Amino acid sequence: ASVNLVVAVLIWAMVYPMMVAVDFASLRHIHRRPKGLVITVIVNWLVKPFTMAALGVLFFEFLFADLIDPADAGQYIAGLILLGAAPCTAMVFVWSQLTRGDANYTLVQVSLNDVIMVFAFAPIVALLLGVTDLEVPWETLLLSVVLYVVIPLAAGTATRALLTGKAGDGGRGAARVARFTAGVKPFSILGLLATVVLLFGFQGHVLLNDPLLIALIAVPLLIQSYGIFFLAYAAAWAWRVPHNVAAPCALIGTSNFFELAVAVAIGLFGLNSGAALVTVVGVLVEVPVMLSLVAFANRTRNRFPTAAENETAASGDTAAALVPEEGRR
């Protein structure tokens, strides 16, 4: 297994602050409003990784086969698989805030996805790499999950426990967590910027000299992003999920945990690899795509019930169920 120490430090700087925000205690309440979580889990773990792999094979082995070097096609597919195999963790809170999402529910969604990611990321990536006839380096995959998910998550959980202290402190623990995350957030931004600069330093010549290749890589990424969003968003609309849950629910699957994808791509294939290039293009594509989807979600807010309307409907259904049939007549 190969680990780039500089990249590892930068990834930790990016990931650790967001892991402090993860609250596993919130998972105790998932049974209260399960619809958004059901959609999130199904789309993120049973649909998204497989559609991304399928799009990669479709475009790079068939539709774009005459436009790219066949020797590089496998690496591009691998990069797409890595991007599609894990939902976003950090930027979800930004997208949720921009769509006026339920911050507490978003936290529950992120916490649940992080738990699943610890156990599901490596097997899903190994399965999809194997199906596409790529070598499955289990040692590096498992090491990457431990380094870039388990260790930051454990450190974040321990930090949160120290900050919150004992229960019943009147919310002071939550305030301490908020102050701490605000204080370390600049390190996360610096880590992100340094990682992007590092990647652009190694991949900049391709980005500047081969715009056609960049456009070809962007095509399946764009189709995947918009397709996954509208799948989750439509499911939430059909199930009458309130907008402050539906919008973050759809955006979580649309966005990728690109920090993990970057780290694993570099560990498996190297800084100069086609897989690493795909993760760089993923970063370039993601922000404008997500902003366009945030704008769409805000414009369609009135198509969804509000949280208050859902609670009223649920209360009405409960009351109706409690009234004997003779009384309803």
Regions found by a protein language model. Give the residues of each.
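Alpha-helical transmembrane segments of multi-pass small-molecule/ion transporters
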Residues: 1-254, 258-329
